[in-house]
């Protein structure tokens, strides 16, 4: 094989590896952002219900605690972006 053909094949393989790594990172970040949005919506619902009724909703609080146990210790301190 000619050196140019070998170089082209190596370049394609390296490009493929880089693309896989980049898309994996993008997928992980999208999952983090979606989870954070879900946590933010739950916190907003808890605040609204607390203002309306004077106490927090048990169901929303339990759901929020499940999300926090899945990976976020402090959902209001996430610096993903």
Curated annotation (Swiss-Prot):
Phosphorylated by host CK2. This phosphorylation is necessary for interaction with human BTRC and degradation of CD4. Its main location: host cell. It is found in: Host membrane. Residues 1-7 are extracellular. The modification Phosphoserine is found at residues 53, 57. Pfam families: Vpu (PF00558). Residues 63-75 have a biased composition (Basic and acidic residues). It is a single-pass type I membrane protein. Coiled coil: none annotated. GO terms for biological process: receptor catabolic process; symbiont-mediated suppression of host innate immune response; symbiont-mediated suppression of host type I interferon-mediated signaling pathway; symbiont-mediated-mediated suppression of host tetherin activity; viral release from host cell. Residues 50-81 are annotated as: Disordered. The N-terminus and transmembrane domains are required for self-oligomerization and proper virion budding, whereas the cytoplasmic domain is required for CD4 degradation. The cytoplasmic domain is composed of 2 amphipathic alpha helix that form a U-shape. Enhances virion budding by targeting host CD4 and Tetherin/BST2 to proteasome degradation. Degradation of CD4 prevents any unwanted premature interactions between viral Env and its host receptor CD4 in the endoplasmic reticulum. Degradation of antiretroviral protein Tetherin/BST2 is important for virion budding, as BST2 tethers new viral particles to the host cell membrane. Mechanistically, Vpu bridges either CD4 or BST2 to BTRC, a substrate recognition subunit of the Skp1/Cullin/F-box protein E3 ubiquitin ligase, induces their ubiquitination and subsequent proteasomal degradation. Homopentamer. Interacts with host CD4 and BRTC; these interactions induce proteasomal degradation of CD4. Interacts with host BST2; this interaction leads to the degradation of host BST2. Interacts with host FBXW11. Interacts with host AP1M1; this interaction plays a role in the mistrafficking and subsequent degradation of host BST2. Interacts with host RANBP2; this interaction allows Vpu to down-regulate host BLM sumoylation. HIV-1 lineages are divided in three main groups, M (for Major), O (for Outlier), and N (for New, or Non-M, Non-O). The vast majority of strains found worldwide belong to the group M. Group O seems to be endemic to and largely confined to Cameroon and neighboring countries in West Central Africa, where these viruses represent a small minority of HIV-1 strains. The group N is represented by a limited number of isolates from Cameroonian persons. The group M is further subdivided in 9 clades or subtypes (A to D, F to H, J and K). Belongs to the HIV-1 VPU protein family. This is Protein Vpu. It comes from Human immunodeficiency virus type 1 group M subtype A (isolate MAL). The lineage of its organism: Viruses, Riboviria, Pararnavirae, Artverviricota, Revtraviricetes. The gene is vpu.
């Amino acid at each position: 094989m000619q050196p140019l053909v070998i170089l082209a094949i190596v370049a394609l393989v390296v490009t493929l590896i880089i693309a896989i790594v980049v898309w994996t990172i993008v997928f992980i970040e999208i999952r983090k952002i979606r989870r954070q949005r879900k946590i933010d919506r739950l916190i907003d619902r808890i605040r609204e219900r607390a203002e309306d009724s004077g106490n927090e909703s048990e169901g929303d609080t339990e759901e929020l605690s499940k999300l926090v146990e899945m990976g976020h210790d402090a959902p209001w301190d996430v610096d993903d972006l």
